[in-house]
């Protein structure tokens, strides 16, 4: 089955516009998913909204969004009021500015999406926008209504296409960088000439290998599928595996641990 686009609209840079389509770069379709079942009847359990105080079900047309003022009071907002704050980014990715590629820290990146031309007429404009960003070493910044909310997005030329990243909101990113940078003092072991650094560098060299997608394969999914297949065939489930306990030995220092690690790899 062909991948279905999750969004269609227009990519715009100043007066240059082209129709585009977009789909998530990652998928959860291969993930094992479960439903909650009534053990007694075998029927599926469904959820519904109920009043927190009375417990009575609340019909769809009686549900409204509210912003909490305190524990028991809310500012209610109607759909019309929420729609009034929407911008023109529902169907147009209007690149507002460009920033040097690599200048945005990893912590801002959220979810990747593939962006591509939606018809043959827009292929040339799309290709020029992509190539110009690549040649200049820049990425584009825009805003887009996606998944029912407006998001800041980054457009990155990659290969022959463009990857659109949703970005975290400014108030969602913690200030001050990594906590370790503020709390951990520098160590002499971190210097390039220290024995610890030399041994760990040697260990890294021995364990370096080309990237392979199998490195991020989820073994839990495979075990779940095995259990499900066994249940379907009427077999008993396999006993739960016990987590392997790390070997402690007599290692009492970083240097001893590194030497022991290298020795396991056949070096001394």
Curated annotation (Swiss-Prot):
It comes from the Bacteria. One of its GO terms (molecular function) is double-stranded DNA binding. The keyword Cytoplasm does not apply. Disulfide bonds: none annotated. InterPro entries: Ku70/Ku80_beta-barrel_dom, Prok_Ku, SPOC-like_C_dom_sf. It holds the Pfam family Ku. The keyword Ribosomal protein does not apply. Keywords: DNA damage, DNA recombination, DNA repair, DNA-binding. Residues 174-194 are annotated as: Disordered. GO terms for biological process: DNA recombination; double-strand break repair via nonhomologous end joining. Residues 13-175 form the Ku domain. Belongs to the prokaryotic Ku family. With LigD forms a non-homologous end joining (NHEJ) DNA repair enzyme, which repairs dsDNA breaks with reduced fidelity. Binds linear dsDNA with 5'- and 3'- overhangs but not closed circular dsDNA nor ssDNA. Recruits and stimulates the ligase activity of LigD. Homodimer. Interacts with LigD. This is Non-homologous end joining protein Ku. It comes from Gluconacetobacter diazotrophicus (strain ATCC 49037 / DSM 5601 / CCUG 37298 / CIP 103539 / LMG 7603 / PAl5). The lineage of its organism: Bacteria, Pseudomonadati, Pseudomonadota, Alphaproteobacteria, Acetobacterales.
């Amino acid at each position: 089955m062909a991948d279905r686009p999750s969004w269609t609209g227009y990519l715009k840079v100043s007066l240059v516009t082209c129709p585009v389509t977009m789909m998530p770069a990652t998928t959860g379709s291969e993930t094992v998913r479960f439903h909650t079942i009534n053990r007694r009847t075998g029927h599926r359990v469904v959820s519904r909204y109920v009043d927190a105080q009375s417990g009575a079900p609340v019909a769809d047309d009686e549900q409204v969004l509210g912003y909490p003022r305190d524990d028991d009071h809310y500012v209610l907002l109607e759909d019309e009021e929420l729609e009034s704050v929407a911008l023109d980014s529902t169907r147009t990715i209007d690149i507002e500015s460009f920033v040097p590629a690599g200048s945005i820290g990893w912590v801002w990146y959220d979810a990747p999406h593939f962006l591509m031309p939606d018809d043959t007429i827009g292929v040339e404009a799309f290709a020029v926008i992509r190539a110009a960003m690549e040649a200049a070493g820049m990425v584009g910044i825009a805003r887009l209504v996606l998944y029912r909310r407006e998001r800041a997005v980054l457009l990155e030329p990659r290969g022959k296409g463009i990857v659109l990243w949703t970005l975290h909101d400014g108030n969602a990113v913690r200030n001050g960088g990594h906590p370790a940078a503020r709390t951990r003092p520098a160590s002499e072991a971190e210097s390039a000439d220290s024995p610890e650094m030399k041994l760990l560098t040697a260990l890294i060299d021995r364990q370096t290998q080309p990237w392979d997608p199998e490195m991020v394969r989820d073994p839990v999914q495979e075990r779940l599928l095995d259990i499900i297949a066994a249940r379907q065939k009427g077999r008993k489930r396999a006993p739960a595996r016990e987590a392997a306990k790390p070997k402690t030995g007599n290692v009492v220092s970083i240097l001893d641990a590194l030497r022991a690690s290298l020795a396991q790899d056949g070096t001394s």
